[in-house]
């Protein structure tokens, strides 16, 4: 995972950003965290094996020249899903605040488009605000 942290003018990268894997005997959940794409995800998969459920960020990615290292775009999010061999992924980090230049609904529209293109319909989904699902 890659990002940066800052809460005031003088504390750049004094705290760490992260993702985490929660494991039980029969289930693994991966909270990817706030990140840009990197090859770290293939290493995570090698360490933990296939993931049962992942929360993967899909928003706040434009302009790419500025956001690429900190926020993955939808195609990169799909690559993370593939890299970690997630059985099911839920999109996060989109649609709450207008943080960047892409339209608020674009990440979900692109997720639906690229999920179909990659045969991931119902495997990588975006929930509407307040929506729940059974796992």
Predicted regions: what they are:
Residues 28, 35-127:
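Cap/insert and terminal regions of metallo-dependent hydrolase folds
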Residues 1-49, 113, 129-135:
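Core dinuclear metal-dependent hydrolase active-site scaffold
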């Amino acid at each position: 995972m890659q990002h940066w942290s800052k809460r005031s003018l003088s504390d750049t990268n004094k705290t760490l950003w992260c993702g985490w894997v929660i494991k039980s005997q029969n289930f693994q959940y991966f909270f990817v965290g706030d990140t840009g794409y990197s090859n770290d995800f293939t290493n995570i998969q090698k360490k933990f094996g296939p993931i049962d459920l992942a929360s993967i960020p899909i928003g706040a990615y434009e302009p790419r020249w500025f956001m690429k290292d900190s926020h993955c775009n939808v195609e990169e999010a799909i690559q993370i899903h593939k890299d970690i061999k997630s059985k099911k992924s839920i999109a996060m980090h989109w649609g709450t605040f207008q943080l960047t230049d892409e339209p608020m609904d674009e990440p979900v529209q692109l997720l639906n488009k690229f999920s179909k293109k990659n045969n991931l319909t119902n495997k990588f989904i975006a929930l509407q605000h307040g929506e729940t699902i059974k796992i």
